[in-house]
Amino acid sequence: MSELKGPDVNVEAQDLKYTPERAEQLLQNYRRVLERIRAAEQDRSGVRTEQSAPVHLVTVTKFFPASDAAALLDGGVTLFGENRDQEARAKARELVAYCEQRAVQPPHWAFIGQLQTNKAKSVVKYASSVH
């Protein structure tokens, strides 16, 4: 994430406000999905083994404000995903500034979907994976 710098990327840290109720709602939903994933991981009837890596839940923030991502980040969620480069880039910028204010590590971002050649240079500035 440290590469997310430059004239078009530097932003003032905004106060990404959210209510405790909204944070709890988001975290409950996240935990519910994660519990279902962990329960499904226990089913070894497929190709998964005890040595298989755990499944990583990518929290997609499409159509949701950066403040929701901040609430989840403050609750311990560290992996977010987007399929729109401009929206992802803006949220990544906001969260980098938010994390710098708090002296915490910024989250990892995944770009989801077809990566067009003209967007590749932009996406690699914030995303650590493409799916």
What is the predicted role of each segment?
Residues 2-131:
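Conserved alpha/beta-domain cores
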